[in-house]
A protein has these predicted regions:
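Beta-strand-centric surfaces of beta-sandwich/beta-rich domains
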Residues: 1-236
Length: 236
């Protein structure tokens, strides 16, 4: 598939913008749906821009998939995406981690990618924060007792909500992150799946994990699973 371009712009609480390569001409139409799954009326406005031109023969079909586990089953890895079949490219993900434990780091788990049916991970990252281009607990300053958020073009820990960051690992915090594989593309020929451990210094944890994964396939594919029920579709 063609090298993708993916850029997000988020204004706190009110605006979500996405700039993404898609090719509706390959299917003659592009349908976008905004569904209100709550019990109150909401105000929505939108604008869609596009460019029409020649489509590369190698251009893939864009896919996105939402998944959550609230909480992650203790001792079992969180599945970011699985069941992808065919030839394609994994683009990246947006990720949220909500703390349910205390007095321990949550980033000791290893993100793992299994490409083309391998029983062992083809790519095994050294830790959760390392995958999101951080290190050492996202630069948690022991003296200042404060996390260091950052926002880059391809990766970032752009926000921390919940208790004040001076609580360090003891607070009920929510970490919001993203990672896009543009400079380090991830290709697959037959299949792809990705998992992420939920581990701390003292062992397995039971935090709330939420993610949206993005990928391209050479032909349209079914999503791995349906969305959660309305009552479960909540960021805790």
């Amino acid at each position: 598939s063609q090298e993708p371009v993916s850029t997000w712009a988020v204004t706190k609480d009110v605006t979500f913008s996405l700039f993404q390569d898609t090719y509706p001409e390959k299917t003659e139409k592009l349908t976008m749906v905004m569904e209100n799954r709550g019990d109150k009326e909401q105000t929505l406005y939108y604008m869609v821009e596009g460019w029409k031109g020649d489509i590369p023969a190698s251009a893939g079909y864009f896919h996105a998939f939402y998944r959550q586990e609230h909480p992650v089953q203790k001792g079992r890895a969180y599945t970011v995406v699985d069941g992808l079949e065919g030839k394609g490219q994994f683009v990246g993900l947006c990720f949220a981690a909500g703390m349910n434990g205390h007095n321990t780091c949550w980033v000791e788990g290893e993100p793992k990618m299994y490409i083309d049916g391998g029983q062992h991970p083809t790519i095994n990252y050294t830790g959760t924060e390392d995958y999101f281009c951080g290190s050492y607990g996202f630069g948690n300053d022991i003296l200042q007792k404060q996390y260091q958020t950052f926002s880059g073009l391809y990766a970032g820990l752009y926000a921390i909500t919940g208790n004040d960051s001076s609580e360090m690992y003891n607070g009920q915090q929510r970490f919001l992150l993203y990672r896009f594989h543009i400079q380090d593309p991830v290709y697959f020929s037959k299949s792809f799946r990705m998992t992420m451990d939920n581990l701390g210094w003292t062992g397995p944890r039971y935090d709330d994990y939420t993610s949206v994964a993005y990928w391209y396939l050479e032909r349209p594919g079914a999503l791995p699973a349906p969305l959660p029920a309305d009552g479960e579709l909540v960021m805790r």
